[in-house]
A protein has these predicted regions:
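Extended ligand-binding regions for polar small-molecule ligands
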Residues: 44-56, 117, 124, 129, ...
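Short helices/loops that flank or line small-molecule/ion binding pockets
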Residues: 69-81, 158-178, 185-186
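Extracytoplasmic small-molecule ligand-binding "clamshell" domains
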Residues: 20-95, 153
Length: 243
């Protein structure tokens, strides 16, 4: 079962109308955007953003930890209201409204030990290499749908990094703002980023289920998010999490 976090997001302001709806945000660990403290409470950039969105919009939010793939299924059925840190895909857009504007972007990149990443200069150099990736993630076209590549999916970024560190995989794809942060905290294996950099960024959104019973509140959240992005508040919140 998912764990509901009542710490930061569960403290509702007294001015909110009694009986007002509480929207459920489903997500999983993805440092530095979403991390777990020793008390199992979430913290990180996305949590700071959600806290400010709650304050600006007056909409109560509660956070529930759910594996990423299951979270997407809950968005598809309307069991969950929101997800944060979402990359856009055509398949997801069938059941998720991507609230505008996007609030952050990262660059996809390939990582491994020096001998593994040194030959990677172009996309074509990925042929014949086993590449680790996180299941249910979106990176860039044509990689995501390229059936000619030898791709090995795992459930989480943490597991993927450990497999590369231990030599079970020689190469992995990730997003720089997540993997660079992880490596800045610990990189005993000496993992490096390949020179080849895909040209398209991974743009991150707050998404609302099209089947949410609170779908009408989407524009209110989008307006609050837009104000945060345009004022530079999101950029300010992000600075402590940048390696």
């Amino acid at each position: 079962m998912g764990k509901t976090s009542w710490g930061v997001l569960g403290l509702l302001f007294a001015c909110w109308v009694q009986g007002a709806p509480t929207l459920t945000v489903v997500t999983d660990v993805w440092p530095p955007f979403r991390m777990l403290a020793q008390d199992d409470e979430f913290h990180g950039l996305d949590i700071d953003i959600l806290h400010q969105l709650q304050a600006r919009s007056g909409i109560a939010l509660t956070l529930k930890r759910v594996p990423w793939g299951r979270a997407l299924k809950q968005m598809q059925t309307g069991q969950a209201d929101l997800m944060i840190g979402l990359a856009h895909t055509r398949e997801r857009a069938a059941f998720i409204d991507y609230l505008q504007p996007p609030y952050y972007q990262c660059q996809p990149a390939f990582y491994g030990k020096a001998a593994a990443v040194a030959p990677l200069k172009t996309y074509a150099d990925l042929r014949g290499r086993e590449i680790g990736y996180v299941l249910n993630s979106a990176y860039f076209a044509p990689f995501d749908d390229d059936s000619q590549l030898d791709k090995h999916g795992v459930p989480t970024e943490d597991q993927l990094l450990r497999m590369v560190e231990r030599g079970h995989l020689s190469l992995m794809i990730g997003t720089d703002c997540q993997v660079d942060y992880a490596l800045s905290q610990r990189n005993d294996a000496g993992l490096m980023k390949a020179d080849y950099r895909p040209p398209h960024p991974v743009v991150l959104y707050l998404g609302m289920s099209k089947h949410s019973s609170h779908h009408a509140l989407g524009p209110v959240l989008a307006q609050a998010l837009q104000a945060m992005v345009e004022s530079g508040e999101v950029a300010t919140l992000a600075k402590p999490y940048q390696p």
